[in-house]
Swiss-Prot record:
Participates actively in the response to hyperosmotic and heat shock by preventing the aggregation of stress-denatured proteins, in association with DnaK and GrpE. It is the nucleotide exchange factor for DnaK and may function as a thermosensor. Unfolded proteins bind initially to DnaJ; upon interaction with the DnaJ-bound protein, DnaK hydrolyzes its bound ATP, resulting in the formation of a stable complex. GrpE releases ADP from DnaK; ATP binding to DnaK triggers the release of the substrate protein, thus completing the reaction cycle. One of its GO terms (biological process) is protein folding. It is found in: Cytoplasm. GO terms for cellular component: cytosol. Pfam families: GrpE. Its main location: cytoplasm. It comes from the Bacteria. This is Protein GrpE. Belongs to the GrpE family. PANTHER family: GRPE PROTEIN, GRPE PROTEIN HOMOLOG, MITOCHONDRIAL. The keyword Membrane does not apply.
Amino acid sequence: MSEQTQQQNSEEAVENVEAVETVETVGNADGVQEQAAAEPAYEDLQARIAELEAQLKDEQLRALANEQNLRRRHQQEIADTHKFAGQKFAVEMLPVKDYLEMALLDQSGNFDALKMGVQMTLNELQKAFDATQIKEINPKAGDKLDPNIHQAMQAVASEQEPNTVVGVMKKGYTLSDRVLRPAMVTVAQKEA
């Protein structure tokens, strides 16, 4: 390479170094400005994060308190339901009690009047049962024994098919499909 070319290359190299130094200086100046600008944005973000965290914590506490209130209210409703479960039936039974008390107060000795009073009482009791969905289990002779609703009290020799109802000793009752008392029945067994 010639001296002139070397000198030209040296001058270009010096110019490039100066240009790089200028860019770095400008870059550093911009970086300082960017860093200075970034710090307020960072602080704003930190403040916003703290604000959102506080808001979230407040919402969590409110949700927890609401859940506890709902649980307490639900438990109170269950307790009230148990406490007053028989209220409807009790109200329905009041006229029955009234009729029985009137029958005891009757001093006439009239058997027909007493019988009529008992019939009225039975009618009121049946109304109370209907209103509270208490149904009779009253199987007929020949019905198949159902252990879910019948209780075999005795077995008797009969011409009927075995394990069928021969007679009813006491009626059974259900409350909304739940057996309160099974019907107490006599069932047929094979003749010996």
